[in-house]
């Protein structure tokens, strides 16, 4: 076999050309101890707080405790594959998540990875840091646009505006999630109108819930056709505590994408009590000193930095908004516990749900006396403001009188009238689950109650009367609904036409 020296030389020269002297430098450390989802790592001297690190088995973690001797890392996922002496690599990146419209209709985990079996996200999807500072004072503006929930009792008495943070608080099994899901479903008609300025994209964050519950919510939204403008971020009960702690921030970052690009988004945190418990678990395992109820000292900051990111931006900054509906579960109606009081003080109002009302059949079980919106009528259309103005006062007087009426039987006519009106209004505010109403339908319904047109209608017939008057307006007087929807006002001639329609129905209804 002949060897041609020139060929050998050519090959060698090519090999030398390809040879590079660039070595890949990575900062690595070693696992000192691991257990309960926490790893103590030695050697990562330049690691940043909140930085992602990678273990030799491919699992990820986040550096939270930066101490002089070692670094405390919380592990995302199973820690059983990690053992003492394993190599830990810095990734150089702070925890981030995919953002954008590609996530609509998807279910993702606490890190933004799809878990719905519909395939991976597009590689070109934008990514954004999970922990960012909330907008300052100058970029914000006052809340002025309504965020319609489709529930009469909320839209008329505790209105929520775009860019507001309204807490939903109550014991277990009082319908907190149902209120939030109704708010998502109600956006369908608004989003179908095609007006990009009115569209509201929704993000539902499930923290520490059963997988079956999350699946049920996904199914409900799909059946209502609401998944096409919704993203579900799920850190279920079987997920590691760091993922449950991180999921709300991940969801918030996804919502901020819409807010910062001049669009509107709604985010629901279900629920923040479980996030606080997950954070307490992490903090205690990281040997951080406990405070009240064994929560760490910065548990207030945990929620305040999250909820402050919900805002209505000024027109110079695009005029986008992020509305937050955090949910808190109380124990035995105790709203003076640590986490409930914290979140009440951070938010712009709260919707109280009570077990007692729920069991009486008043659903949604909203305690109108204790519920408040600190934005108030600024977040209502003129028509709703006009018809529901006196409603809160009438219901407050009714509750006061109802308490005294139990003791006395001989009541004067005005008291009897007040009690009658109050019971009719309470009945009117009941609403079936997953059947939200448009603003125009709500205005007609509340108008009937407040103006006294239901005073002589039997209590059991109120729901039927309400559905009939709305049906009659839709079929015979659609201009009433159109006028309220287009102008947001209840004009004099529209009101007169509505009164005539009500009187016409009452003639046939009572006979």
From Swiss-Prot:
This is ATP synthase subunit alpha. The gene is atpA. GO terms for cellular component: plasma membrane; proton-transporting ATP synthase complex. It is an enzyme of class 7 (translocase). Disulfide bonds: none annotated. It is found in: Cell inner membrane. Its EC number is 7.1.2.2. It comes from the Bacteria. ATP binds at residues 170-177. Belongs to the ATPase alpha/beta chains family. NCBIfam families: atpA (TIGR00962), PRK13343.1 (NF009884). Keywords: ATP synthesis, ATP-binding, Cell inner membrane, Cell membrane, CF(1), Hydrogen ion transport, Ion transport, Membrane, Nucleotide-binding, Translocase, Transport. It is a peripheral membrane protein. Produces ATP from ADP in the presence of a proton gradient across the membrane. The alpha chain is a regulatory subunit. The record marks 371 as: Required for activity. InterPro entries: ATP_synth_asu-like_sf, ATP_synth_asu_C, ATP_synth_asu_C_sf, ATP_synth_F1_a_nt-bd_dom, ATP_synth_F1_asu, ATPase_a/bsu_AS, ATPase_F1/V1/A1_a/bsu_N, ATPase_F1/V1/A1_a/bsu_N_sf. GO terms for molecular function: ADP binding; ATP binding; proton-transporting ATP synthase activity, rotational mechanism. F-type ATPases have 2 components, CF(1) - the catalytic core - and CF(0) - the membrane proton channel. CF(1) has five subunits: alpha(3), beta(3), gamma(1), delta(1), epsilon(1). CF(0) has three main subunits: a(1), b(2) and c(9-12). The alpha and beta chains form an alternating ring which encloses part of the gamma chain. CF(1) is attached to CF(0) by a central stalk formed by the gamma and epsilon chains, while a peripheral stalk is formed by the delta and b chains. It catalyses: ATP + H2O + 4 H(+)(in) = ADP + phosphate + 5 H(+)(out).
